[in-house]
C-alpha cells in the first residue's frame, strides 16, 4: 500500500513547490485540474479482533459458579426500617444464633413478645403477619407496626426512667457509663495536647527575643 494517496500527494507537492529549488512536475497541473474522486489506497479491515471479541465460554464460566440471588419480603422491610431508624442499630443486640423456630413460640398477632426483645425484627415480623392475616396493604401494615413499636419503646423508656429514679431514692449510686468514660479520656488527651502546644508556641515566640530559651524542654 502506498504511503500517500493521490490527494495527499498533490497537497504535499504543492507545499514543496513553494520552495525556490523545487521545479513543477509535468503531472501536477493535470492532477490539480482533475483530482481523484475516491480513495485509491486500499484499506484493510480486520475481520477478527481478539481484544474486542469474547468467547461465549468465558461469559458462561463467570456466572456458572455464582449463587442465584435470593430475595425475601423481609429483606425489603428490614432495610427500610433501619434506613428510617439508624439509631436502632446502636442498641445492644444478642448475636447468638437461635434454633430458627421462632414461629413456634412467637405470636405476632401482637407486637410484644415475652421471649424476644423488642427490635426492628419485631416490626418486620409484625408487618408480615398483618399482610398475611389481615389482608392489609404493605404500607398500611408497616405504618401500624411502626406505631405499635413506638408505643412499646416509649413504655420501656418510661419504665427504665422510673426504675432509675426509684433506685436513686433508695440510695443507689450509678457510675459513669463506658461511653461517658471514653469521652472523658478523649477530653483529657485533648487538653494535654492543647497545653503542650500552647507551651511550645509561647516558647517559639520568645525565642526571637531570648535565644537562651530551649524549646525542646517545653515538649517534655
Swiss-Prot record:
Keywords: Mitochondrion, Ribonucleoprotein, Ribosomal protein
UniProt keyword Manganese, yes or no: no
Primary residence: mitochondrion
GO molecular function, one term: structural constituent of ribosome
A UniProt-annotated Pfam family: MRP-S25
Gene Ontology cellular-component annotations: mitochondrial small ribosomal subunit; mitochondrion
Function, as annotated: Component of the mitochondrial ribosome (mitoribosome), a dedicated translation machinery responsible for the synthesis of mitochondrial genome-encoded proteins, including at least some of the essential transmembrane subunits of the mitochondrial respiratory chain. The mitoribosomes are attached to the mitochondrial inner membrane and translation products are cotranslationally integrated into the membrane.
PANTHER family in the record: 37S RIBOSOMAL PROTEIN S25, MITOCHONDRIAL (PTHR37799), SMALL RIBOSOMAL SUBUNIT PROTEIN MS23 (PTHR37799:SF1)
Assembly notes: Component of the mitochondrial small ribosomal subunit (mt-SSU). Mature yeast 74S mitochondrial ribosomes consist of a small (37S) and a large (54S) subunit. The 37S small subunit contains a 15S ribosomal RNA (15S mt-rRNA) and at least 32 different proteins. The 54S large subunit contains a 21S rRNA (21S mt-rRNA) and at least 45 different proteins.
Family: Belongs to the mitochondrion-specific ribosomal protein mS23 family.
Protein name: Small ribosomal subunit protein mS23
Organism field: Schizosaccharomyces pombe (strain 972 / ATCC 24843) (Fission yeast)
Gene name, Swiss-Prot/TrEMBL: rsm25
